[in-house]
């Protein structure tokens, strides 16, 4: 008979992957290979991970790259490299995965892990763009233009995932084309993630808070029911 801990871990690995938005390493995309028709013109990415990062990784495990959940297809702890296959659709709907460069890495949450950030699915909801990035004292102010499709989910002191990093929204300014959110980055975040390499104009992957998603759905469903009553 399996212990409860084993059952929970198997359940998570078989059915879904969850993350917390706490980056566990910074890697680098070192090669991209066109898969042609085998994956609808997607690509195979080779990522170099930090030393020791792949020691507990297995084939089929989920790792988030800049907030996008991907499946490990090959790995080598000796060379510190692993590969993932990404479809053309995913490349179109994300940012920073179509070229060589640094990426934030997070292994999927295990049943006994701490939930240090907030619940993150690894499904990118949209791409935002950096409008301002400036160091102020010992911290950094990061402003991101979010598309109008995501604006209704963003609120003061709410959670947002930017390139896989769980962050808190400090300000929200509504705009005609969406909204601009302001984030404060502490030195630890800048040092231990790839966010420090961003600059004005950079595209970033955004994932809204899961709770906000369900609240909006319940409210819209309630309004629809009233309209049809």
Where are these regions (language model features)?
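N-terminal amphipathic/basic-hydrophobic helices that include classical n-h-c signal peptides
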Residues: 1-17
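Conserved loop->alpha-helix
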Residues: 14-229
């Amino acid at each position: 008979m399996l212990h409860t801990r084993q059952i929970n871990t198997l359940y998570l690995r078989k059915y879904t992957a969850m993350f917390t938005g706490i980056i566990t390493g910074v890697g680098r995309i070192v090669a991209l290979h066109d898969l042609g028709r085998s994956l609808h013109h997607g690509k195979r990415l080779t990522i170099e991970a930090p030393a020791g990062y792949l020691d507990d990784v297995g084939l089929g495990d989920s790792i988030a790259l800049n907030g996008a959940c991907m499946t490990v297809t090959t790995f080598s702890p000796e060379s510190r490299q692993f590969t993932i296959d990404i479809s053309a659709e995913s490349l179109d709907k994300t940012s920073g995965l179509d070229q060589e460069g640094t990426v934030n890495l997070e292994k999927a949450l295990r049943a006994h892990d701490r939930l240090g950030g907030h619940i993150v699915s690894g499904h990118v909801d949209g791409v935002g763009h950096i409008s301002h990035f400036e160091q102020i004292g010992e911290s950094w102010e990061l402003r991101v233009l979010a598309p109008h499709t995501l604006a209704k989910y963003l609120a003061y002191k709410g959670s947002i995932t930017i390139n896989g990093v769980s962050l808190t929204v400090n300000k929200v300014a509504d705009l005609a084309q969406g909204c601009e959110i302001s984030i404060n980055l502490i030195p630890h975040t800048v040092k231990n993630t790839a966010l420090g390499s961003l600059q004005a104009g950079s595209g970033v992957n955004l994932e809204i808070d899961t709770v906000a998603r369900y609240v909006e759905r319940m409210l819209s469903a309630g309004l629809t029911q009233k309209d049809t009553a």
